[in-house]
UniProtKB/Swiss-Prot annotation:
This is Small ribosomal subunit protein mS23. Component of the mitochondrial small ribosomal subunit. The gene is rsm25. Pfam families: MRP-S25. It is found in: Mitochondrion. It comes from Aspergillus fumigatus (strain ATCC MYA-4609 / CBS 101355 / FGSC A1100 / Af293) (Neosartorya fumigata). It comes from the Eukaryota.
Amino acid sequence: MGKYNFTALRVRQTALRQHAAGKIRAPPKWLDVVADIPPAQVLVRNQAPQHQLVRQRVKTLPGTSKPQVVFEVQEKRIKPKKASRMFLPTEIKYEEDQLRQEFFRDHPWELARPRVLVESTGKDSEHYDWSRLQQPGKRLDGESVVQRQLWLLNNVPDMTKSAAYDIARCEFYRLRLQEDIERRVAAEEAEATGATFGPSLLEVGMELENQEYERWKAWAKMEAQLLDQKTAAFTGAPEIAAADDAVEELEEKVPVPV
């Protein structure tokens, strides 16, 4: 049999032999069906189809007065594949992936904001109107910028990727600034009515930094003392060495009686 296993292909022949030898009393009900529709015997593995990225754009074509919807196919670079990677499944790509990568590369701290992870169909963005950035019932985040930029590319005539990114980014900055102002005003109103919020994040960070500095200062002082003790073990204590030098000077000045 070699490296190929034909047991599944020969299941009908095996059932007939077992029935003839008396191992099974009656032939299986699927015996005639397998005889009419035998399993495939193709041993050649086909390569997975390669899909290209299709983008929707609204452009004003030459000779037309109104913008038209145009579907562009992104040319895929043809590069040789290794034999071990030839039959791997095709990688699924969406246009949003490139927009999302660009936004979070420019705004990495947006990933540090808390997010609400709710299991859904993954098509929540289709239920919103992305003609504006802020959506009712949805928290403003980086995904809103990505969907807003994609809507501009798909619906605004002759819109470029950089221009759509600038428009969505400016709207995002304006809404973020509005949220910060609302948060600051709410905190001031609460403090005016007697609420206390405790130390701010900056004050907490400074306190932790001071504690770390004091811990390092104590450690450095102990290390300096240990270093002085190691040095004194070889050369003697500084005060003893100074006393020995003074005794030697006195002995040189004062004559010893004979």
